[in-house]
Amino acid sequence: MNYDQMLERVRKGDGFIAALDQSGGSTPKALKGYGIDEGAWADEQEMYALIHDMRSRIISSPCFTGEKVLGAILFERTMDGQVDGQAVPTALIEKGVVPFIKIDKGLEDEADGVQLMKPMPELGALLDKAKALGVFGTKERSVINSANAAGIAAIVAQQFDVGRQVLAKGMMPILEPEINIKSATRAECDTLMRSEILKHLDRLDGDTQVMLKLSLPVVPGTYEALVDHPRVLKVVALSGGYARPEACAELAKNRGIIASFSRALLDDLRHPMSDDEFSGSLGTAIDEIHAASLT
């Protein structure tokens, strides 16, 4: 698939986007959930090798195909690695799965109720490398913890600023201003953020489009104006700490939004499983998340 074919695939295809982009800070937790305890690796290199093996097992599984998985978001080290002797983005594309790369470098300390993204001084080089490997788009995460209008305005502005840099390289940005589902002012956060996003969408040039990755809203349908906006290619939802049944139930209440789940996709996978058990468990998760993404 070339860029235009991947664009059409994301625009019109059924399915969801698998989030396989745990970075250094969240890798030990992901491995523990997979059944590998922290003492199993001697250094960071071995830790990353173990998480790469887990991701390789997912990507090479017979049930992980473009039939139900529209795309996959990768951590940089995963993008640079191989699956069954192929570069990971190439392996995904051959399965009909559109590759994305996580580009943010973590979060700043909270200010004005939000956590902005840390600076990304090497963003240009990362985008050039990713594009050369056939990667279609990017994903960048920041976090909203409370309904502070100034903080939310700043977080959305930063997301669009970085998104423009991605667009300038001929790639598709997924903007992810995540709302903490434990926030006491979550519903107000939803509406404040929606208003800020709409302002920035209306300022985009010509037929430019972006993607949005958002927390599931308190009130179903809150993001329909974003789903229907001509400057939005697709709205995807993170599971945000919900277990899979709850995440799928909440997602199904929101027309036009598809899943981009990590924990809710990977929760039941365990390292000691046989390949058949692993594929069976992964296949069940894929089926459930795919079904919830069709509403």
Label every model-predicted segment:
Residues 138-212:
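Eukaryote-skewed repeat-based solenoidal scaffolds used as protein-protein interaction platforms
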Residues 1-136, 144-146, 189, 196-214, ...:
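Alpha/beta catalytic barrel-like cores
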